[in-house]
């Protein structure tokens, strides 16, 4: 609870990252933290089921912040951050007309977060709540014509509840995820040619977008939301909300079967969030109403010594096909 602490985490191989954190705390005062995060990511990004681009980018993020130093369930922090984001390779497939010659972007911003976790177990919990709310506001410049000044923010949240129906046998897991981007330089079409043309994502700078797809929240960027039935990473509009319900049953001692259902909506602005859109493609000009997404799947899991081993079978109205996903261990 008191004194100096430092930790280092890294991932080698594909999509490398490194996280270094140093902190000093005292029982009577907030904890003082210094953090450095590095990410080297390469990913294919889709416009729903059409490949838009393949991109590799480097991200450096420095943070100094204060956080609480006493709670086992709450985690609260506020501070400043400096971020450098550099596209190393941008290869377009769908929108070849967009200029890919972009330089690094530097931002200075403030951030705050509130995380809560009182789950009864780290693996396959049966009761409790886990949630997070993260807010950032960034000011930045780009040394390339197009985006000169940036003033934009992001509000991202996630919630998981574990409700036992039959003790140690059947669990209901409601979930809610969302992200909202706003300000000058966000993807609402206020600052550069791509935005003015499509009123949609800014693909060369992933951290200025919302992404959906896969099973893990925040895997590639902070505003990356999971969606069952979509294994590919896809762009989304400024405002995204996804509701999900899992029903998990324990078949044997360490074997589990989970039925998963989710529904999502995305729109350019909040005024259009509850208006229907006829097609899913964000590239359809002048149609800013919300898209409707749905997906469902089954997951078979085994609790092993090195972490969960699972196989997902899923589909959605976005992919329009059956998807398979195999996972071994934890994402952290």
Task: Place the predicted regions along the sequence by residue.
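Membrane-embedded beta-strand positions of outer-membrane beta-barrel proteins
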Residues: 20-22, 34-36, 76-78, 112-114, ...
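Outer-membrane beta-barrel transmembrane domain signature
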Residues: 100, 104-108, 169, 173, ...
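Membrane-embedded beta-strands of outer-membrane beta-barrel proteins
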Residues: 6-8, 22, 62-66, 112-114, ...
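Strand-connecting loop/turn motifs
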Residues: 13-17, 69-73, 128, 165-171, ...
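C-terminal outer-membrane beta-barrel translocator/porin domains of Gram-negative envelope proteins
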Residues: 111-115, 119-251
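Gram-negative/organellar outer-membrane beta-barrel architecture
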Residues: 1-111, 119, 123, 221, ...
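Flexible, surface-exposed loop regions and adjacent strand-edge segments
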Residues: 37-42, 83, 92-100, 148-152, ...
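C-terminal beta-signal and terminal closure region of outer-membrane beta-barrel proteins
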Residues: 273-332
């Amino acid at each position: 609870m008191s004194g100096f602490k430092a930790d280092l985490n890294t991932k080698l191989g594909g999509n490398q990252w490194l996280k270094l954190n140093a902190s000093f705390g005292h029982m009577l005062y907030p904890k003082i933290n210094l953090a450095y995060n590095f990410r080297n990511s390469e990913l294919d990004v889709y416009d729903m089921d059409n490949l838009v681009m393949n991109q590799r980018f480097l991200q450096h993020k420095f943070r100094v912040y204060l956080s609480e130093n006493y709670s086992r369930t709450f985690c609260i922090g506020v501070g400043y951050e400096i971020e450098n984001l550099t596209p190393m390779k941008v290869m377009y497939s769908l929108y070849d007309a967009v200029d890919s010659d972009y330089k690094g972007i530097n931002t200075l911003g403030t951030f705050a977060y509130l995380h809560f976790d009182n789950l009864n177990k780290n693996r396959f919990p049966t009761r409790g709540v886990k949630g997070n709310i993260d807010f950032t506001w960034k000011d930045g410049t780009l040394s390339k014509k197009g985006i000169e000044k940036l003033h934009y923010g992001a509000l991202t949240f996630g919630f998981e509840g574990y409700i036992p129906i039959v003790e140690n046998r059947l669990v209901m897991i409601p979930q809610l995820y969302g992200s909202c981007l706003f300000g000058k330089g966000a993807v609402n079409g206020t600052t550069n040619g791509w935005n003015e043309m499509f009123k949609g994502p800014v693909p060369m700078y992933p951290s200025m977008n919302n992404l959906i797809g896969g099973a893990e929240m925040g895997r590639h960027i902070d505003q990356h939301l999971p969606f069952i039935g979509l294994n590919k990473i896809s762009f989304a509009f400024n405002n995204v909300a996804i509701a999900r319900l899992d029903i998990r049953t324990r078949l044997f001692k360490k074997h589990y079967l989970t039925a998963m259902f989710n529904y999502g909506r995305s729109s350019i602005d909040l005024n259009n969030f509850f208006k229907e859109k006829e097609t899913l493609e964000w590239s359809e000009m002048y149609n800013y109403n919300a898209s409707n997404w749905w997906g469902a799947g089954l997951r078979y899991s085994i609790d092993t010594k090195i972490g969960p081993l699972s196989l997902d079978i899923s589909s959605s109205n976005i992919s329009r096909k059956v998807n398979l996903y195999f996972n071994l261990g934890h994402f952290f």
